[in-house]
C-alpha cells in the first residue's frame, strides 16, 4: 500500500535515562520503505516542537505517523488533534511505548534494550503500512442535561461551574440535605441502573418508592467517601468509638469530648477498602490542634502508621506539636490493640521509641475513610471500572485526572479516593468544566476503532453478548450479531473470545497484528 509515514522520536521519553542510541533509531527509520519524514524532538507534547512536527508532516504530505514515546494515555491529546488538522486521523497515529516497555525495564542491559527498540520500530512501520482510515459518524444529543451524583463539596463545585457555562444541572443526593443548588436538586434519590452512552444516557433513579428514567448527556460521579459502620478488632473492642467527622461535628457544636482523646488512622488494620489519604491526615492534625485549644489540659494522641502533611498542612502539624499533641507511629505488623477486658486502654508499640505504650482514653476516634458503598452500584450502572480501593477509576492521572475511560462520564472528589476539601473542590470544578464542554458540542462522535462482525461466520452463540461490559453486541434483524457503534468502546474483548472468529477489532485485525508479530519476531509464520 502506498503511504507516507512520519516517524517522531521523543527524546524526553526514550533518552531519560540515557540508554538508547537515538541516531541509530533515526537511521533505521529513514531507510525504511514509505518513511518520508523522521523527526527527533525534545518533547512531542511541547507546543513549539509540535508545530514543527506538523509543519514537516504537511510539507511531506504525511498520511500516517509513528511516535516513539511513552504510553498512549500519557501523550498530550493535542498531538492527535494537531495530526487530525494535518489530515492524519487518530487511528493512523501509532504510539510506541518505548519508555515503559524498553527504557525502564532495560536500564541494566543497554544492548538488549537497543535491539528491542529497533525491533519495535520496524514492527510499528510494518503495522502502520497495513492500517486504513476509519470512518466516524455523529449523532445529535437528545438533551443537554448534566447529572451530578452526590451533593458534597465536589458535587456542588461541579454543579456551579457547569451551570455558569450554561448547562442544565441535576444533582442527585441520597440523603435529605437541603442545599442551595444552581439547578435541580433531587434529594432522597439514588441511581439504580442506567443505559446508553456518552451524550445520550438514560439513568434509572429511585426516589422513595417511585422509580423513573432520567435522560442526560453527561454524568459526574461525586459520591464522596463512605462513613460506613466501623469494623475490625479495635471497633469491636471499643463500642463507643466514633469516626473523625463525628468529632469534627461535636467541636463545631461547641461540645468538647471527654479526654484523653486518641485519634487512630485506621479502624481495621486487616480490613479492605480502607484508604487513609490527605483528607484524613489533614483533618487529624487540624482537629487535634482544635482539641488542645478548646481544652489545653486534655491529653490528645495521634496514633498513625503513615502521615504526610501536604502543602500548608505542615503548619497544622507544627501547631499541633507545639500545643502538646503527642504523635505515636506504629509499624504495620504491630498495629494498635485493645484488650476487650480493658476497652478504655489502647496498647501500641511506638516504632520511634521501640517500646510499647499503653494509653487510657475517654474518646477513641478513627480517622480513615472507607470507600463509598454506593460506588459499585453506580459503576455497574454506568459501565465504568473501579479501583482496587473501591473507588471509581479515572482515565489517566496525568492527562485525564477527572475523566473515566468512558466518554461523557466524569469523576471527582472522594469518589476516586479520600480527598481534602480543597482538592475535592478543585476536582469538582475541573469535572464541571469538562462536562459542560462535552455537552456544549451538541453531538456525539462514534465509530473508528470498534468491533466488526462477519455475519457469515457468526453462530449466534451469544458469547460476545455475555462478555461485553458495554452491551454493544446485539441480535439484529437478520438473526445474527451486530455491534451498536455508539456503545462499543473498542476494548476488543468480543473479538478475543469469539469462538467462530466472526468478530474483528478495526485497526487491530488479524492481518495487521500478524504482520506486526512476524516483523517483531523476525519470522514467517
Regions found by a protein language model. Name each.
Residues 1-525:
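Residues forming the flavin
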Amino acid at each position: 500500500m502506498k503511504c507516507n509515514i512520519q516517524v517522531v522520536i521523543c527524546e524526553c521519553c526514550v533518552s531519560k535515562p540515557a540508554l538508547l542510541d537515538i541516531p541509530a533509531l533515526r537511521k533505521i527509520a529513514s531507510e525504511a520503505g514509505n518513511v518520508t519524514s523522521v523527526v527527533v524532538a525534545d518533547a512531542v507534547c511541547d507546543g513549539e516542537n509540535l508545530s514543527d512536527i506538523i509543519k514537516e508532516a504537511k510539507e511531506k504530505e504525511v498520511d500516517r505517523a509513528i511516535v516513539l514515546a511513552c504510553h498512549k494515555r500519557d501523550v498530550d491529546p493535542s498531538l492527535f488533534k494537531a495530526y487530525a488538522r494535518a489530515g492524519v486521523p487518530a487511528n493512523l497515529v501509532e504510539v510506541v511505548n518505548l519508555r515503559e516497555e524498553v527504557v525502564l525495564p532495560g536500564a541494566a542491559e543497554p544492548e538488549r534494550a537497543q535491539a528491542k527498540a529497533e525491533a519495535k520500530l520496524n514492527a510499528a512501520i510494518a503495522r502502520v503500512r497495513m492500517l486504513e482510515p476509519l470512518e466516524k459518524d455523529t449523532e445529535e444529543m437528545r438533551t443537554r442535561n448534566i447529572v451530578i451524583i452526590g451533593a458534597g463539596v465536589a458535587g456542588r463545585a461541579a454543579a456551579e461551574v457547569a451551570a455558569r457555562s450554561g448547562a442544565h444541572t441535576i444533582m442527585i443526593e441520597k440523603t435529605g440535605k437541603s442545599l442551595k443548588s444552581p439547578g435541580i436538586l433531587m434529594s432522597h434519590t439514588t441511581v439504580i441502573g442506567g443505559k446508553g452512552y456518552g451524550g445520550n444516557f438514560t439513568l434509572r433513579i429511585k426516589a422513595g418508592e417511585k422509580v423513573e428514567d432520567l435522560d442526560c448527556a453527561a454524568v459526574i460521579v461525586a459520591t464522596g467517601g463512605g462513613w460506613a459502620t466501623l469494623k475490625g478488632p479495635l471497633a469491636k473492642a471499643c463500642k463507643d468509638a466514633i469516626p473523625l467527622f463525628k468529632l469534627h461535628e461535636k467541636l463545631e457544636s461547641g461540645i468538647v469530648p471527654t479526654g484523653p482523646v486518641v485519634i487512630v488512622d485506621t479502624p481495621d488494620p486487616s480490613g479492605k477498602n480502607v484508604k487513609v489519604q490527605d483528607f484524613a491526615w489533614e483533618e487529624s492534625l487540624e482537629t487535634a490542634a482544635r482539641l488542645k485549644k478548646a481544652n489545653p489540659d486534655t491529653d490528645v494522641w495521634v496514633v498513625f502508621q503513615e502521615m504526610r502533611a501536604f502543602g500548608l498542612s505542615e503548619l497544622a502539624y507544627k501547631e499541633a506539636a507545639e500545643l502538646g499533641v503527642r504523635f505515636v507511629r506504629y509499624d504495620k505488623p504491630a498495629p494498635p490493640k485493645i484488650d476487650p477486658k480493658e476497652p478504655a486502654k489502647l496498647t501500641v508499640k511506638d516504632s520511634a521509641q521501640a517500646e510499647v505504650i499503653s494509653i487510657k482514653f475517654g474518646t477513641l476516634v478513627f480517622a480513615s475513610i472507607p470507600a463509598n458503598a454506593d460506588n459499585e452500584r453506580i459503576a455497574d450502572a454506568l459501565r465504568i471500572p473501579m479501583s482496587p480501593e473501591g473507588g471509581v477509576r479515572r482515565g489517566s492521572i496525568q492527562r485525564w485526572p477527572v475523566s473515566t475511560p468512558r466518554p461523557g462520564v466524569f469523576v471527582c472528589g472522594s469518589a476516586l479516593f479520600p480527598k481534602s476539601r480543597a482538592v475535592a473542590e478543585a476536582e469538582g470544578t475541573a469535572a464541571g468544566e469538562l462536562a459542560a464542554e462535552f455537552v456544549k458540542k451538541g453531538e456525539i462522535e462514534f465509530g473508528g476503532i470498534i468491533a466488526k462482525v462477519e455475519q457469515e461466520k457468526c453462530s449466534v452463540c451469544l458469547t460476545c453478548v455475555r462478555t461485553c461490559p458495554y452491551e454493544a453486541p446485539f441480535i439484529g434483524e437478520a438473526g445474527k450479531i451486530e455491534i451498536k457503534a455508539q456503545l462499543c468502546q473498542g476494548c476488543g474483548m468480543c473479538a478475543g473470545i469469539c469462538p467462530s472468529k466472526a468478530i474483528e477489532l478495526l485497526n487491530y485485525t488479524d492481518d495487521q497484528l500478524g504482520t506486526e508479530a512476524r516483523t517483531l519476531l523476525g519470522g514467517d509464520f
